[in-house]
Each structure stands twice: as structure tokens, then as C-alpha cells.
Amino acid sequence: MYQGLALAPNHGQSAYSHDSGNFLHSSAGSPVYVPTTRVPSVLQTLPYLQSCEPHQSHLGNPPGWAQSSGETTAFNAGSPHPPSGFSYPHSPRAAAPRGVDGAYQGPLLLGGGGREQYGNALVRSVNGSYSSPYPAYVTPELPPSWTAGHFESSVLHSLQTRQAALPGRRSTFEYLEEFPGDGRECVNCGAMSTPLWRKDGTGHYLCNACGLYHKMNGINRPLKPQKRLSSSRRAGLCCTNCHTTNTTLWRRNAEGEPVCNACGLYMKLHGVPRPLAMKKESIQTRKRKPKNITKGKTSTGSTTSATNSPSSITNSDSTVTLKSEPSTTSQYPGQGIVSVSQAQSQSDEALAGGEFKFEPEDYPFSPSSMAPQPGLSVPLRQDSWCALALA
């Protein structure tokens, strides 16, 4: 079925009359490929790059390894047809003459120099002939639907029309992306995006807010009021009543004229215009007290009462210690000595009155007066009441 490369018939001249030094056989018998540098000559041998030129006449020669007496071969690496020394028996052989152009060209040239009549119909050159880099298995019974004209009209023309229509479609998509609501706009407020589009009685589109307002109240939704002007933009305003330009709040009277805060409040409370004699150059502001002042008062009152209680106890103790003298008779002139019972009664009276006054007497102290007295047998701090005072 398959013929070896060595059994291929030699027809004398090689099928490809180009540089014969590209494919060399070494002494061992293995071929060595040497790439060619002549690119234009390679491009000229490609049949699908030829615009309207007829096929080369030497393409009709039978393919094969045309080996000469030497070890060189005439195979060119730039040839589009692979070398073939065998043929497929089921492929039909062409009966066309060798010099006729315009027939169907296949990748394998079968027989003694004849061309294959039918090839692959999907790859078409410019001059009307068909060529393919793959073996041709198409039988002569080619269906008419695979003709070149129908293929171009059904596939290529549809692709061209799609490419021509792409710019128009892109512009439409960009327009819809800029306006996500399919280009809708609320006829009342002019909104272009809303969670839900509604319609009024006339069929116009309304946004969700305007549609609900119109449905509930029966009237169109009022537009948002304009933002109030800043204080810098109101610098030219003047009170209609007192002609002042300085106020914390601008008001309007019954006629809609701007008035200052003082004149507006006076008119609202008394029903008559504010007298000009009450006009003041400076604005009197209210001194607001902090809101947590009551909590501060209760906390300070509790702390003062808590601090006063131990101080009163210490004062009462101090009165007892100052007024206590355990002697009944006065041994020194100018010094009054009070008994313990009298001192306790006086201290109770002082506590009841709430006041205690200590009035020292003027008398000279001598070193002998500071010495311990012989009449005192018991120290003063050893009494029972003194221990309570010092506790």
C-alpha cells in the first residue's frame, strides 16, 4: 500500500528547482537540515500568498525524493508541500493536463505528474484554486452546498455584517449604562434613578417618591425647598422695623418682609410693632445654665453636711479641754479656775447655743506658774472625762 522513500521513481529533474544545499545527507545516512536565507524565494513558492498569478508549471511534477548520483537532494525547506513518496489508493487521481491552471490543487500530487482535482474547500486562494496543507479525503461527490459562493455568502458576509454593526451597538450600550433606568426621567422632580418607576394618570413616568405622594394626596409632590442662604449672603438684609443689620435670627412679618429677631418676637407676643426706643446696638444673649447644675448642688450639699459633723464634735471636745480645771480655789491672782461640773455645764450651754467664745485674761506668766502644783495629787489627763475627750 505504502511505497518506501527509496522506491520512489526518479523522474530526472527535481520537483522543486531551488537551492539544493538545504537538505544534505551525511556519510552515516542521517539527513542534516540547513535553513535557507532566501526568504523571498520561499515566499514565492507559497500558493496562498500569490495574488492572481497562475500556478507554477513545475508544481505538476510528481513529488518525491529526487536523489542524484551524489548525496545531495533538491528539497527546499520553504516549500508548502511535504515530500511524499507514497500515495493513498482511495484518493481519486486527476485526469487534467499538466499545463492547465485554475483546477483544484491538493497537498499530495498523486500519479505520474497529475494534479488532484478535489481538495479542501475551506481554504481558498485568491486566483480561484483550492489548496490545503492536509491530505485530501473529499470524494468527487461533493455536495453543492459547499461551493465557494455559498460559503462566502452565508458565513463571511454574516461576520462582516456583525463587525459593521458592533460600533452602533456599543454606543447604544454606553448610552443605557449612563442612564440605568432605560432613559426614564421623573416628570415631577427630574430624578433619573429610583427603586421603582411609577406612572401617573396620563402615562408619564414618576419616581417612587413622587408616585406615592401623588397616589396618597392626589397632588404632585412639592419639590424640595431651596437651601437657606448662608450668613455671608444675608449681609445685605435689613430689618424693616428698626433698620438693624445685626441679628442672630432673621424673621418675617405678616407682609413677608424681613425683620430682626427682637422685632419679630415683640410683634408675635404683643401684636404691635416694637418701639424704636427699645433698639440696642449690642445683642443681649441669654446666659443659659448647664443642665446638670441640680445634680451638682445635691452632691455638694451632702459633702458639706458630712464634713460638718466631725468638726462639730472636735469643737465640743476642744471646749471641754479648754474649760476644765480640777481646782476649787485659785492659788494664783488673775486666773479663774472652774470645777469639773461647772465646766461640763458650761460646755453643754455652749453646745446648745452653737457658739463658743474663749476670752483669755491678761496676766503675766512666771516660770514658777508653769511648774507642777503640789496640791494636785492626780494628773489632769487621768480623769475619766479626759480620756473620752482624747479618744
Curated annotation (Swiss-Prot):
Signal peptide limits: none
Gene label: GATA5
PROSITE patterns linked: GATA_ZN_FINGER_1, GATA_ZN_FINGER_2
Protein name stated in the entry: Transcription factor GATA-5
Listed GO CC annotations: nucleus
Family annotation (PANTHER family): TRANSCRIPTION FACTOR GATA FAMILY MEMBER (PTHR10071), TRANSCRIPTION FACTOR GATA-5 (PTHR10071:SF289)
Main location: nucleus
A GO term, aspect molecular function: zinc ion binding
Cell compartments where the protein resides: Nucleus
Biased composition (Basic residues): 285-294
Pfam (any one): GATA
Start and end residues of each stretch annotated as Disordered: 53-100, 281-378
Biased composition (Polar residues): 66-76, 317-348
Tissue: More abundant in stomach and small intestine, lower levels in heart, lung and spleen. Very low levels in liver and ovary.
Keyword DNA-binding: yes
